[in-house]
């Protein structure tokens, strides 16, 4: 009886430790989609040098993180995120998930990016489990940032016993940047 109790306690502790999440600052991982590395804030698209020469509406839109994504690799069974929205945007014609949520994609063996799930925001400060109960194997991820809001901070949560590291695959390739400028139809927010 005593031996069974000890085994139960050990198993309970192992599963409890495994279930805990550890959060890692996303600024430690590659950020895709910025015009330049010299932008003022980490999750803004334009450098501060453009502030005084840009129209105010354009400058304000540049503070949204649309088109930007974080790349990382992990063997975690759970991926979570903590983030603070810059403006806490709400729109009548779009859900908060579309405006200030996050979208997680996983790189498949055939080279395609597959949608995993969205992190649905509850307010300005958020903590969401994006996916859980996965098989523990190394995967490449891309976490897309909010379309119509910016970020103050972002952390990625993984199992306490899992690894999280720099991506091994340089994909999408970033050698020759392409700039798109247009309306929300181009962005995909409205049609």
What function would you assign to each model-found segment?
Residues 7, 162-164, 187, 191:
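A generic structural micro-environment signature
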Residues 175-191:
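Catalytic nucleophile-elbow at a beta strand-turn-alpha helix junction centered on a G-D-S/GDSL motif
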Residues 19-177:
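N-terminal secretory targeting modules
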Residues 1-21:
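Bacterial Sec-dependent N-terminal signal peptides
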């Amino acid at each position: 009886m005593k031996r069974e109790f000890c085994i139960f306690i050990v198993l309970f502790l192992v599963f409890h430790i495994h279930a805990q999440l550890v959060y890692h600052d996303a600024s430690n991982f590659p950020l895709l989609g910025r015009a330049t590395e010299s932008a003022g804030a980490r999750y803004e698209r334009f450098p501060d040098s453009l502030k005084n020469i840009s129209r105010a509406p354009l400058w304000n839109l540049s503070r949204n993180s649309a088109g930007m994504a974080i790349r990382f690799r992990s063997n975690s069974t759970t991926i979570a995120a903590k983030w603070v929205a810059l403006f806490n945007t709400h729109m009548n014609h779009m859900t908060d998930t579309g405006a200030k949520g996050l979208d997680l994609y996983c790189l498949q063996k055939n080279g395609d990016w597959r949608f995993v799930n969205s992190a649905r925001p509850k307010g300005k400060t958020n903590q969401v489990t994006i996916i859980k109960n996965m098989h523990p194997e190394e995967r490449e991820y891309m976490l897309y940032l909010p379309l119509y809001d910016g970020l103050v901070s972002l952390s990625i949560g993984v199992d306490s016993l899992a690894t999280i590291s720099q991506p091994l695959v340089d994909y999408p390739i970033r050698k020759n940047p392409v700039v798109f400028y247009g309306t929300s139809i181009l962005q995909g927010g409205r049609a």
